[in-house]
């Protein structure tokens, strides 16, 4: 059941600390029931993120999509076309609901993100083409196109930003890759500036994934079985994210940035993603309470949003004072024989594969629905 709690003091405090609250979920029901509008009005939600898994769950349920599916079946569209028409319709509707936020914040918030086809994660040119098509299909100024931070995704980010399209860079797990993402963004801004595009119209976030880092490293710490290993559980993800913020501060105080800022460029904000706690031993608001820093975004599932409203512990900046401890924690993990580079590479590969599976499941579900309504579903 979709509900809106009246406990919002913690969410107001989080917003006041400079953290933009985005909802990591979207469905036709959430739009048509008025729930999304309620969350914006009463729970400080100022943006929405989607991904293939979210759309697979929403459209796979069928709820709210029957009429559009019937229309698409009559028109004889392909499965891929049907999926894109349904997902972009949801994103367009959400963008319209969030448009007042977009206008009030000068484009900083009020954003809705939609991801390129995950099957293209290792194809630069196809990703660029898909990003341009999605921006055209949604046709709203407050859409952000999600491009994965794979090696092939990096030049696509530069190209798409260079065209003046706002981008949410997703699936970032490592500090090295995050620096490459920021470099790709700055290169895109430089390209846009050279082409005479107004930099003030370009916004970007870099989605740094959090809880999955703990899930994998904690599993390896448990295998180590020592007291030292046990003491490090639940620390790696926060350490990783805090050091990412340190890198953000460094890059956006550097010469490349200071050359772009006078032209109206916006910093690429860090976005904390995968902030739902997966280990029941941890407080369910851990990745919200402990990642409060100015100029960030935290996109959270509704359960985490409600938990933060109810019993979150928002008490100022919990990031910038922790860089030395963060480095110490990651170094301690390495000393136990757990390779940081190996973990983050595995997480990236698994995340891309997971979204490919979800997209395949979505295509299959839509094909079945189209066939059931008289289309061939090819």
UniProtKB/Swiss-Prot annotation:
Pathway: Carbohydrate degradation; pentose phosphate pathway; D-glyceraldehyde 3-phosphate and beta-D-fructose 6-phosphate from D-ribose 5-phosphate and D-xylulose 5-phosphate (non-oxidative stage): step 2/3
Catalytic activity: D-sedoheptulose 7-phosphate + D-glyceraldehyde 3-phosphate = D-erythrose 4-phosphate + beta-D-fructose 6-phosphate
One Gene Ontology cellular component annotation held by this UniProt entry: cytoplasm
Pfam families (alphabetical): TAL_FSA
Active site: 146
Record-listed E.C. numbers: 2.2.1.2
Enzyme class: transferase
Molecular-function annotations in GO: transaldolase activity
Keywords recorded for this protein, A-Z: Cytoplasm, Pentose shunt, Schiff base, Transferase
Localisation: Cytoplasm
An example Gene Ontology biological process: carbohydrate metabolic process
HAMAP family in alphabetical order: Transaldolase_2
NCBIfam families assigned: PRK03343.1, tal_mycobact
Name of the protein in question: Transaldolase 1
């Amino acid at each position: 059941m979709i509900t809106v709690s009246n406990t919002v003091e913690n969410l107001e405090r989080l917003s006041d600390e400079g953290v933009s609250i985005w909802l990591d979920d979207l469905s036709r029901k959430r739009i048509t029931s008025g729930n999304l509008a309620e969350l914006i009005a009463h729970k400080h939600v100022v943006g929405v993120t989607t991904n293939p898994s979210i759309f697979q769950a929403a459209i796979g349920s069928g709820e709210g999509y029957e009429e559009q599916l019937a229309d698409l079946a009559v028109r004889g569209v392909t499965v891929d076309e049907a999926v894109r028409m349904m997902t972009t319709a949801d994103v367009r509707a959400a963008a319209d609901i969030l448009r007042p936020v977009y206008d009030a914040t000068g484009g900083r918030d009020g954003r809705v993100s939609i991801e390129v086809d995950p099957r293209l994660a290792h194809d630069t040119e196809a990703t660029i083409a898909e990003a341009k098509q999605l921006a055209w299909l949604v046709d709203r100024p407050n859409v952000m196109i999600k491009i994965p931070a794979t090696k092939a995704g990096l030049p696509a980010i530069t190209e798409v930003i260079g065209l003046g399209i706002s981008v949410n860079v997703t699936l970032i797990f490592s500090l090295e890759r995050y620096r490459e993402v920021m470099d790709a963004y700055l290169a895109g801004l430089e390209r846009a500036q050279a082409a005479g595009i107004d930099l003030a119209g370009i916004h970007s976030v870099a989605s740094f994934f959090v809880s999955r880092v703990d899930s994998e490293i904690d599993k390896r710490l448990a295998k180590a079985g020592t007291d030292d290993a046990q003491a490090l559980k639940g620390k790696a993800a926060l350490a990783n994210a805090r050091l990412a913020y340190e890198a953000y501060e460094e890059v956006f105080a550097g010469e490349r940035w200071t050359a772009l800022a006078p032209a109206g460029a916006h910093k690429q904000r860090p976005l904390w993603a995968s902030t739902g706690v997966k280990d029941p031993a941890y407080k369910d608001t851990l990745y919200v309470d402990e990642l409060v820093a100015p100029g960030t975004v935290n996109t959270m599932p509704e359960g985490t949003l409600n938990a933060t409203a109810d019993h979150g512990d928002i008490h100022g900046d919990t990031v910038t004072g922790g860089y030395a401890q963060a480095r110490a924690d990651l170094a301690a993990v390495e000393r136990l024989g757990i390779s940081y580079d190996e973990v983050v590479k595995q997480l990236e590969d698994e995340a891309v594969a997971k979204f490919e599976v979800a997209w395949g499941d979505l295509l299959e579900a839509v094909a079945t629905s189209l066939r059931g309504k008289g289309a061939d579903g090819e």
